[in-house]
Swiss-Prot record:
The keyword Secreted applies. One of its GO terms (cellular component) is extracellular region. Glycans are attached at N48, N94, N104, N131. Belongs to the secreted LysM effector family. Disruption phenotype: Leads to a significant reduction in virulence and a reduced proliferation of the fungus in plant tissue. Keywords: Glycoprotein, Repeat, Secreted, Signal, Virulence. Induction: Expression is up-regulated during plant infection. Residues 41-85, 113-157 form the LysM domain. Forms homodimers. This is Secreted LysM effector slp1. It comes from the Eukaryota.
Amino acid sequence: MQFATITTLLFAGVAAAMPQATPTSAAPPSATSTCTPGPVVDYTVQGNDTLTIVSQKLNSGICNIATLNNLANPNFIALGAVLKVPTAPCVIDNISCLAKQSDNNTCVSGVSPYYTIVSGDTFFLVAQKFNLSVDALQAANVGADPLLLQLNQVINIPICKN
């Protein structure tokens, strides 16, 4: 872009010189843009990791990771699992793989039938993590006191029979 003329603007006694652009023969910008995604990297799941955390660490999307790894439930990843993570995908997808929220589900599919309690867990939070009703989780764990969950305690997750 070249500046060929100068226009003077006056505002209540203030003068300012503003350059005026004149068209040049430069080529117009291309109408199509290309995207080059980043590499796919291996990531080992660590304590307290979720797909949200992993996706934020590696500039990816929850569903980009879930789809590449054929995860049946993106809300559950196993500690120590090695995930393939597409870094900097052209389209970051954080929603297409997520089930519609419902607190009435009595069972789930595609996950382990067991869950190990971690710090801060409650029956409500575990039920929410697996998209289950609290009643269904309690029914699968007769004898477990939901108010006295212990770190590393293993509880049952109700699995749907297909």
